[in-house]
Structures are given as C-alpha cells and as structure tokens.
C-alpha cells in the first residue's frame, strides 16, 4: 500500500545519503 511506497522512498533516500 501507500506505506510500502513511503518505505521504498526512504530506502532510496538513505542510499543517496
């Protein structure tokens, strides 16, 4: 669901950092 999308975005953001 939406939470899964948020989790994915956070994972990608962490990778960028």
Swiss-Prot record:
Modified residues (Leucine amide): 17
The keyword Secreted is annotated on this UniProt entry: yes
GO cellular component, one term: extracellular region
Record flagged with keyword Secreted: yes
Keyword terms, alphabetized: Amidation, Amphibian defense peptide, Secreted
Compartments in which it is found: Secreted
Gene Ontology biological process terms from the UniProt entry: defense response
Tissue specificity statement from the Swiss-Prot or TrEMBL entry: Expressed by the skin glands.
Family, per entry: Belongs to the gastrin/cholecystokinin family.
UniProt name for this protein: Caerulein precursor fragment-related peptide R1
Source organism of this protein record: Xenopus ruwenzoriensis (Uganda clawed frog)
């Amino acid at each position: 669901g939406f939470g899964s999308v948020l989790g994915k975005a956070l994972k990608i953001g962490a990778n960028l950092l």
